[in-house]
Each structure stands twice: as C-alpha cells, then as structure tokens.
Amino acid sequence: MREEGSELEMEKGFLKWKPVNLMKKILSLPMKKTKNDIGLRLDISYILVNLIVCSYPVNTYPKLLYRNSLDDLILFLTVYHGKGNFRIFNFRGEKEDSDYKDNDLIGIAAKFESKDFEIQELRSTLINDGKIPISPIDLETRTLVEEETNNVICERIGWLDHFPPPFELLEEIVDGIENYLSVSKNRVAVLHCRMGKGRSGMITVAYLMKYLQCPLGEARLIFMQARFKYGMTNGVTIPSQLRYLRYHEFFITHEKAAQEGISNEAVKFKFKFRLAKMTFLRPSSLITSESAIVTTKIQHYNDDRNALLTRKVVYSDIMAHECGGNMTFIFGRDYLTLENDCRIEFTLGTSKSKAASSIISWTSCASCWLNIYLETLMHIIKDDSSPDYFQVERLKRDEMLGTTISWQELDGFGELSTHGLKLFQALKLEWEII
C-alpha cells in the first residue's frame, strides 16, 4: 500500500476523483491509518492481516463529512479481501437515527456486485503487485475448521461507550471472531465501536491474549502501536476495561473444560450472592461535612445493553461513621440478587438545593465495574486449588468475601483519567454467598 493520496470512488466501472475532506483528516489525527492504493480516505488499522479496527462507518450527511464512508469501507474490503471474505463486528450499544442498517449493507454489497468485473480486475492487480497488508504476527500455524457458509455481513453485539461488556459477552465475542476467522485464511474481521479505541481495543486485546497467546501487556502494546500514532494515546486505558481484561487473563489460564465449567457456574451464581456492606475508607473532609452528600448508585445493564438499570441508591448522610473515620452502609437482608456484572457510581452533591447539586456533580464523578463471581473466584483460588473450586456450592464461606479498590483505580469522566475532587481513599465492597 502506498502513501495517502486523493480519494476515489467507483463509478461507471472505474474510478472518479473527488476532493480530500479536511474534517476527516483532523478528526482521525491520533489514528495510524492504513494507506491504500485506490485513493479511499478511511480510518482503518490492521492489527493482524485478518483483524482490522476502524472508526464508525456512516452513509448519511452530515456525519459523512468526518466519519468513514460505509460505501468506501465495503469497497475497500471487497477489493482487498474479496467478496464474502469479511464480516463487520459492531460494538456500539448506543442508538442513533443516522446508524447504518442491515439493509444499507445489503444494498451496498449488491451495488458492487454489478461492478464485479472491474473490482476483480483491480483486486488482481493489487495481488500481483504484492500490495496486500502484512500482519506483524505469523498466522500460518492456525488450524482451519469447517463451517456452514452464511452471508452475514455484520454482527451487532454492542454495549455502552467507556464501559466493559458483561464478562460472558466478552468471551462470546472473542470466540465468535475466532470461529469466523478459523474457517479460511482469506477471511478478515472488521471491528468498530465509535472511534475504534476502547471497546474495539478491549476485544482486540482479549483476542490476542486468547488465540495468539499474547500476555496482557504485550497485547495492549500491539493494539496501541498498530492503531495509534506514537505518543498520542496508550490505547485501552479505562480502569474497568483493564479490570475485565485481567478477569479474561485469569479465565484463560484455565483448561478448556474448566473454562466451560466457570461459564456454566456463573449463570447460577447471580442468584446465590448478596451484596452486604459498602465502606468508604478514609473519606475526605468534604463528604463528612453536613452540607455535602455523595450519591452512590448500584447499576447493571438492561437486556439490550444500551442503558443502565439502577438497583439501589445510597446517600452518604445515612451511612454510619466508624471509630476509624470510615463510612459504612449495610445492605438490608431483602437485597439479595444482582447481575454478576455491576457498576457502582459515586457523584458529589449538596443537601442545600437540587440546582446546586446539579452543578456540584460535575466537580467529582467516579465509578467502577465489577464481576462479583470472578472477584469471588480470584479470592477463593488462593485457598482452594481443587479442580472444581469454581462450583457455586464450594464457594460458601463463613466470612464475608470482598474487594478493595483505590480512588485512582476508579473510572473518571468518560474516557478521561480525572475524577475531579477526591471523595475517599478507597472503596471496600463485601458480599456473602447464600
């Protein structure tokens, strides 16, 4: 592939010049874009020869001014990888009227069917010239498997921006990508979220860890160096997304049979634990004052993973003050079940007025995602290394189980590392198996 040039589009069997769009160039500055020899201006990055990450493609204005063109993306994939050899994995959970539909994909694919001769001619030229992307990792040792042929162009498996997916979904997606790619060395998986950073990065890193045996640190580095220009970003950085990658790291150290066992037991576990106690360790003087209130929300995804459901709200003015200065809340006995994957959010407000609280809430905001089942396993395995230690019935203990997360390990505003005003030194969460 050559250096970036002017953008071209297929028309009347060949190519037509059109001006380069400045907005696309500005918005994709941090990305290390793969150049192509047919003049298409696309924000795409090859992580492997058969694994692409890109930003969100669109087919309507005004977003066509600064996003990937869906037409251009499909044309690129058809020319460089061949008709029927690619599948798009869409990780966006948020919905907008301008989102591309399945019918849009089908229509674009059909349009290029009518230009098949010209596309195949162009593809043959590129192959003969050796202008096919090269992967930094050798894939020759991959074992191919047979699969029934299907014409699915896109799989929509999304969740909300800046968050990790439910852990079971993370494993399902990674395995789904491998199942698709393992059918043929000609196939390519195209991953996108909004910017091709956090959600796509998580899945890419998890895939490299599981199927190319890369350590977590190395997998993060491969993604960062392949997707971004030097010094622009560290790639996947949101603490909860990294926590779920560490869960994944823990999970894949088990043999395949144990992995299946853990997945099966996780379904049972969500009805077998009770959130018992929450403690703010060394709270700041700010939240121990009479006027300031910290609102804690305990949430999980809805079924479509495009919104959060709030299961419990706790206000700091009803928390107990312990001798050491810590603040605690003990959950009622009726509060028994949560999803394994839950989110805890902390916002600062005031008891003086709603308007003031709304303004103050922007001065401090922090949150975290946890998978309670995996947190339990990572605690239990220190004392119980039996082959079936992960079974729910073996997890019961007389004492509470728990985890402590420092303020710095919480998520901040969106993808930013900043949390605003520090509310406490650390969060301690405790639960019991019932």
Curated annotation (Swiss-Prot):
GO MF term list: phosphatidylinositol-3,4,5-trisphosphate 3-phosphatase activity; protein tyrosine phosphatase activity
Stored CDD domains: PTP_PTEN-like
Example of a GO biological process term: phosphatidylinositol 3-kinase/protein kinase B signal transduction
Catalyzed reaction equations: a 1,2-diacyl-sn-glycero-3-phospho-(1D-myo-inositol-3,4,5-trisphosphate) + H2O = a 1,2-diacyl-sn-glycero-3-phospho-(1D-myo-inositol-4,5-bisphosphate) + phosphate
Residue span, Phosphatase tensin-type domain: 33-255
Organism of this sequence: Saccharomyces cerevisiae (strain ATCC 204508 / S288c)
GO cellular component, one term: cytoplasm
Enzyme class label: hydrolase
Active site (UniProt): 193
Enzyme Commission no: 3.1.3.67
Functional description taken from the UniProt entry: May act as a phosphoinositide 3-phosphatase by regulating PtdIns(3,4,5)P3 levels.
PANTHER family the UniProt entry points to: PHOSPHATASE WITH HOMOLOGY TO TENSIN, PHOSPHATIDYLINOSITOL 3,4,5-TRISPHOSPHATE 3-PHOSPHATASE AND DUAL-SPECIFICITY PROTEIN PHOSPHATASE PTEN
UniProtKB keywords: Hydrolase
UniProt xrefs under Pfam families: DSPc
Name recorded for this polypeptide: Probable phosphatidylinositol 3,4,5-trisphosphate 3-phosphatase TEP1
